Design a protein with these regions (language model features):
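Loop/turn-rich, solvent-exposed surfaces of beta-rich toroidal or solenoidal domains
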Residues: 243, 248-269, 273-316
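Beta-propeller blade signature
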Residues: 222-232, 312-327
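Short, conserved, GDST-rich strand-edge loop motifs in beta-rich repeat architectures
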Residues: 44-56, 109-120, 206-223, 298-318
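Blade-loop segments of beta-propeller domains
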Residues: 78-145
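Asp-box/WD-like beta-propeller blade repeats and closely related beta-sheet repeat scaffolds
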Residues: 120-194
Length: 327
């Protein structure tokens, strides 16, 4: 089973989280001239809203180039898309009470207010309403994936400083863990640490695009220099991955996206052996599960030096930006 929603036009990058042909439109994104670009629009398969309805869930997606947080919600058999503008949103973390969004220079926190939800239109059909509560200034740390752990502690992938960090009321961020090959904290994106997988409320797996201690050193071998690591040991579970992202532990298995190949893979954490189980026409970033279903974010990938020389850009295929659901 594969179902899809495509975010068309100016949408080039996605991150996501979960907790008939349809079409929706919104205004042009923040920081982009609305007079020069068409509106952001989406097209989906008939089964997509039906799946969300069966799950009794909505899907939250960020697209950093379009500057949007997008909520995909089932409504009367159709898909309702709700857009909100943010400054280059990427990382998302959520539970029943809190929604946090990592953007350019800060992390914004929203609190679920059930009393407000009861008063929102359509009356009786809105079961959650996340209201803005505070914003934490991090500076330019290139926030990638985030996750809530034990005691609602927010863990953040600090890509610029090559570490995992948390937040407090005094500092921009508090470094908590870094790969063993990183010798110090400096804002030069040495290994492009990006993905974070939690187990039992604690960080357990991370991905990086290179095993390097040099400033932006990961770029030299981005095609197949990616690694999947254990936390806190720092042991490298597997190497030679093509731009890996979004490690997840689900149903007793370790999953990871090889973005450079557009794949969803299963990894044996003991041997490091990995097997692709699904291939998609896009740069895979952002992964969440609901039962047997995997929700996967896809980006089109811009033709720049950063993305040149990787398998998916060398293939003569039409790349999509959106969300795929794989059973």
């Amino acid at each position: 089973l594969v179902v899809k929603i495509f975010l068309e036009s100016i949408c080039k990058g996605t991150r996501l989280t979960t907790k008939q042909q349809g079409e929706n439109q919104t205004e042009s994104p923040a920081k982009i001239d609305a007079n020069t670009l068409p509106p952001l629009r989406s097209v989906h398969t008939e089964s997509f809203p039906l799946i969300l309805s069966e799950m009794r869930s909505s899907l939250a997606v960020t697209t950093y180039q379009a500057g949007k947080l997008v909520f995909l919600r089932p409504q009367d058999g159709k898909l309702n898309t709700h857009f909100r503008a943010f400054d280059s949103p990427m990382g998302l973390a959520a539970n029943q009470q809190i929604l946090s969004i990592g953007t350019s220079g800060y992390i914004s926190h929203f609190r679920n207010m059930p009393a407000v939800a009861q008063k929102r239109e359509p009356i009786g059909k809105v079961d959650a309403c996340f209201m803005p509560r505070d914003s934490h200034t991090t500076g330019d740390i290139l926030v990638h994936e985030m996750a809530y752990g034990n005691n609602n502690e927010l863990w953040v992938v600090n890509t610029r400083f090559s570490c995992l960090c948390t937040l407090d009321n005094v500092n921009s961020f508090v470094p908590r863990w870094k790969p063993p090959f990183i010798t110090g904290y400096s804002p030069n994106d040495r290994c492009h640490l990006n993905g974070l997988g939690m187990v039992d409320g604690k960080p357990k797996y991370v991905t990086a695009l290179g095993e390097t201690n040099k400033p932006t050193g990961w770029r030299a071998n981005k095609k197949d220099g990616g690694i999947l690591m254990d936390v806190p040991s720092g042991e490298i579970i597997t190497r030679n991955l093509s731009m890996p992202h979004s490690p997840r532990w689900h149903n007793g298995q370790l999953w990871v996206l090889e973005s450079g190949k557009g794949t969803l893979s299963i990894v044996d954490p003991k041997t490091g052996k990995h097997e692709a189980i699904a291939i998609m026409p896009g740069f895979t970033r952002g992964l969440d599960f609901f039962g047997p279903l995997a929700f996967i974010g896809l980006s089109q990938v811009r033709e720049t030096a950063v993305f040149s020389g990787i398998p998916i850009t060398e293939q003569n295929i039409e790349r999509n930006s959106g969300v795929w659901v794989v059973n």
